Amino acid sequence: MLFAMIGSGGFIAPKHLQAIRDTGHFLDCSFDVHDSVGVLDEYFPQSEFFTNIEDFEKHLEQSKAMGKEINYLSVCTPTHTHFDHIRFGLRNGMHVICETPLVLDPSEIQELKDLEMKHQKRVFSLLPLRLHCDTLALKEKIKSELDKNPEKVFDITITYISIQGKWYFSSWRADVNRSGGLATQMGVNIFDTLLYLFGGVKDKVINREEPDCVGGILFLEHAKIRWFFSINPEHMGVAKEKVYRRMIIEGEEINLTQSFDNLYIESYKQILAQGGFGLDDAMASIKLAYELRNLSVSEPNEDSHVLCCKNKTDQ
């Protein structure tokens, strides 16, 4: 299979480049407005590169005219550009593999469905946490518990801290209109996995929301989840990790920080084998993140995450 890519200079692009290479396929061409794409030398030094979208599209059209089919477009760009870049790929006759979240507004999912139908191509969302070995094992354990007690509600605490420097607040990520905010950036994959494991949303609250952290309580069909996401190193406590991602279920801790290296490769394998996750799979977590983004903050209570109960002056 031949691939094209938009955003080959982005921080997430190497995971996609490795997945394309390690599944035995080739990157024909890529586009990025920035030309710091030396990473291509490691994976596909012979691929074409463009900094102008019109030149990129012209190359795609010429390739098609010559009978060279470019099958997939990988989208590795900032979140607010995803819809336009997915539409670009479909319009140019490619299936699209896009970083999570696919879009910020759930109403755009239906628009993408219409475009899929129009162009007869698929849009795939990367939901790597669903493929994590601990998630798969947990899915079986939860099923077993619910077989015994269909009304069971699991008690869960999630803490996700990913330390970022001052650059973050000058980047597109700090703009909620472009990134969706921390609950979307850090949470959409986790929310997707929780919905996959524990069922639909019954209620939700936000207990703390600041530029560097957000947290609340999520009530699902089979889980009560207190959650907290942060980019502030002061929230790390004594831990020395750059990324801290922990889930505690009924007192048992699951470390979701490890073993991520192969999840993108496995995601690509499944997509290329006519599997993968589509628009319907992505919808629930995008809708939840959108709704959380539009909630007012409620005072924390005894059910809230401990870090939601601390004031900034207490850190």
Named regions from a protein language model:
Residues 1-46:
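N-terminal Rossmann-like dinucleotide-binding module
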Residues 6-7, 31, 76, 126, ...:
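Short hydrophobic segments within beta-strands
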Residues 49-115:
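Beta-loop-alpha module in the N-terminal Rossmann-like domain of NAD(P)-dependent dehydrogenases
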Residues 60-64, 72-74, 270-315:
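C-terminal helix-rich "cap/oligomerization" subdomain common to oxidoreductases
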Residues 103-166:
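A contiguous active-site-proximal alpha/beta segment in oxidoreductase catalytic domains
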Residues 166-235, 280-287, 308-309:
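Rossmann-like dinucleotide-binding domain that binds NAD(P)(H)
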Residues 216, 242-251:
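Short polybasic amphipathic segments
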